[in-house]
Amino acid sequence: FSKADLTINGSGTLTVNANYKHGIVSKDDLVITDGNINVTSASTAMEGKDSVKISGGTFNISAGTNGIKSTNTEASDKGFISVTGGSFTLVANNDAFEAETVLSIQGGSFDITTGGGSANASMKSDGTPNRNWQNNMGNGGGGPNGMGRPDDNGNGTGGEPPAMPTADNTDTTDSTSTSAKALKAGSEVNINGGEFKIDSADDSVHSNGNIVITGGNISAASGDDGMHASGNLTISDGTVDITKSYEGIEGSIVTIDGGTISVVASDDGINCAGGSDTGSTDRMGADQFSSQDGVELNINGGTVTIDAEGDGLDSNGNFTMTGGTVCVCGPTNGGNGALDYNGTATVTGGTLIACGAVGMEEGFGDNSTQYSVLHDLGSTVSANEKLTITDSDGKEILSFTPTKTWQSVVFTSADLKEGETYTITAGSQSETVTIDGIVTSNSKGMSFGRGHGGRRGF
């Protein structure tokens, strides 16, 4: 424990067994550059109130509550965690990394388990409480929305450290919380590099503000959301593989400019919805049909693969696609769609093929500039049957092998041309469609967005 800064920069081994409460605590900045750090704690393993800065070292952490946290709520340039390197094996009953303001990770390797893992989620995949959930620590929460932050590298700027406490008090406060997130921040999570293996009972990556992914390789199994931002969520590079989730990727404005993204979700694959999470077991929005201002899904690049039991791509506002490649294996029930939007859906570039059930299917709107097709086949196609779309010369334009049954498909490609006839082949079925306008459809499904995706409790 230190009332001032605490720096660990040796190459030796430090082992801390904190059977009563916290492991390593600094009331100011906690800085670690090297060493083998082993911490077993009844409460928080490592805390720097003003900041935590880690550039190297090997960490083996088992925490009764939180793993690594920074808690200063009084200054916008404090309360951050910056990690540029290191190897972390971290098991926490609550959050693994929790920053009151910004969590910035530029490199390192991370093997993280929280709350007993995704199998011990507080909610079942259908949104009902999981009776196996054992944590009993009240209501979760990170830092407040809109809190200021340090620069993008997570380095605090300006300001003097707070005055030393007048009392000789070595205690720090652990907020009581059922929160069992892997990477959590109050204003922003910024990931520019690193290798991540996450198994979390709660959200794998969570911000009360924004999430920015510009690099790294993330593999996550989540008992709730794979990634959740109450503000904007942007992915421009890196690999994101969400192998298990309730909703895969969620934010008010989700923008994908690049990277390789794969999502498996028991509800929506990508969900864009406004407002704050409520914690209710009712995972639906209050108004399922109205379009929400400031809510958008934008896909401008990258490769996106979705396997969702709910809506594949769901925006309670607009959906715009200008580039990238998207494949959606959507719902098998008619109450959800491979695409779902409440505003407009516009495509000007890129390639998309999305399969799902008949009933609530939607395609792109006629405000698009690239041709698209929404087509319902005569009967259901079995799982693992290859779908191909060929032109009149037999040239394959698109292909996809959905792993679930489906009957409706929406597709778009720069190769589609008006007046051309294309053949849709799946299993024993083969049907033709002639492009007769910017949107060609034989569907009798939904013609407007529904907004089945809602915000939920953090």
Spans of features found by a protein language model:
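A composition-driven surface/loop motif
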Residues: 1-458
